[in-house]
């Protein structure tokens, strides 16, 4: 008999939309609509290895001894009617704008069932037909780093338990995970980092 070893880390799996200016997902409304539909329809995978996330930053992480989740609350956006938001976001877009869109995930991540649920919800609610692409972890990491994806189901890690390291993965078009850029977000994160010395 052998036991399987499962390593746990401070990780949240999230949908990443490549939101560079040339991407169909440059529209914040479209990203929010698809994320809202996914959230409404996704169930925790049945493998028992995952739990539902209450926010991007996992429970239990601290900043200067203060639990981040207790202080920040639940920052998940409340999208009242993602279908209406989707219809509004689609104004002026053609179906051909979505050709070649794939949902990328690492092979052997245990999340194929979840990816199929999300993709099925987008098909049902939005008539969007994306393919699911599973690739080896090394290729997945390279494609995320280079921005060579349209949508990805990806692990967002707090290496060493650092909330700041986790949050710094967003907000910069050059070094961020999604191509999204917000100077105010980066300024606030920098101010907070300097105040805590992290």
Language-model features: locations:
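A structural signal for short loop-to-beta-strand junctions that line the ligand-binding cleft
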Residues: 2-11, 181
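Ligand-binding "clamshell"
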Residues: 2-6, 146-148, 162-176
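Sec/Tat-exported extracytoplasmic proteins
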Residues: 7, 19-21, 37-49, 61, ...
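Alpha-helical secondary-structure segments
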Residues: 11-59, 99-109, 197-198
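Solvent-exposed, polar/charged alpha-helical surfaces in well-ordered, non-transmembrane soluble domains
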Residues: 15, 28, 32-36, 84-87, ...
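Extracytoplasmic/peripheral linker and loop segments enriched in polar/acidic and small residues
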Residues: 44, 128-140, 165-198
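Structural transition elements
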Residues: 48-92, 109-113
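Ligand/substrate-recognition segments at binding pockets and active sites
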Residues: 88-158
